[in-house]
């Protein structure tokens, strides 16, 4: 399953400038997802992070991974939100920032459900630029119906 930016905007509760997923290139709902964030110089966070040396803040890379993870569990096989589930993030574990992300990079976000118990779900997340691992983390979320 794939999703364009309009489907992403309908499925996520976020809006600009905090919407950090541009499209979904692959998804098996409830199992795994591959999404894309095109990092442009016009991102508002580059104004102060850092003047003359713009670097995407690591916490925003993790947020992009969290948004992709949310799409994985709230969308059906047609790429539309099921509308009956909200996702609240509970913790970020084992976050590692391996390389910087700069304007012009295409951030590929990969997330897989690695464990479910009750209404909680743990995701194994990785972000890549040109097939190079830049960030990894485990995200724990609670799903409310």
UniProtKB/Swiss-Prot annotation:
A GO cellular-component term linked to this record: cytoplasm
Compartments where found: Cytoplasm
Catalytic machinery residues: 49
Pfam family, one: FabA
Keywords: Cytoplasm, Lipid A biosynthesis, Lipid biosynthesis, Lipid metabolism, Lyase
Function: Involved in unsaturated fatty acids biosynthesis. Catalyzes the dehydration of short chain beta-hydroxyacyl-ACPs and long chain saturated and unsaturated beta-hydroxyacyl-ACPs.
Class in the EC hierarchy, top level: lyase
Family assignment from sequence similarity: Belongs to the thioester dehydratase family. FabZ subfamily.
A GO biological-process term: lipid A biosynthetic process
Organism: Anaplasma phagocytophilum (strain HZ)
Enzyme Commission number(s): 4.2.1.59
Keyword Oxidoreductase carried by entry: no
Record-linked Gene3D superfamilies: Hotdog Thioesterase (3.10.129.10)
Protein name in UniProt: 3-hydroxyacyl-[acyl-carrier-protein] dehydratase FabZ
GO molecular function: (3R)-hydroxyacyl-[acyl-carrier-protein] dehydratase activity
Name of the gene encoding the protein in the UniProt record: fabZ
Chemical reaction(s) catalysed: a (3R)-hydroxyacyl-[ACP] = a (2E)-enoyl-[ACP] + H2O
Keyword Lyase listed: yes
């Amino acid at each position: 399953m794939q999703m364009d930016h309009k489907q992403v905007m309908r499925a996520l509760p976020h809006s600009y400038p905090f919407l950090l997923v541009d499209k979904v290139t692959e998804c098996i709902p409830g199992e795994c997802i591959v999404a894309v964030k095109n990092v442009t110089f016009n991102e508002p966070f580059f104004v102060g992070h850092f003047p003359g040396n713009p670097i995407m803040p690591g916490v925003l890379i993790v947020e992009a991974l969290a948004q992709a993870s949310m799409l994985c569990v709230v969308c059906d096989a047609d790429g539309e939100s099921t509308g009956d589930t909200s996702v609240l993030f509970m913790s970020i574990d084992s976050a590692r920032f391996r390389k910087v992300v700069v304007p012009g990079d295409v951030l590929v976000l990969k997330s897989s459900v690695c464990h479910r118990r009750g209404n909680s779900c743990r995701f194994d997340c990785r972000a890549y630029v040109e097939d190079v691992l830049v960030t990894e983390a485990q995200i724990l979320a609670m799903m409310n119906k």
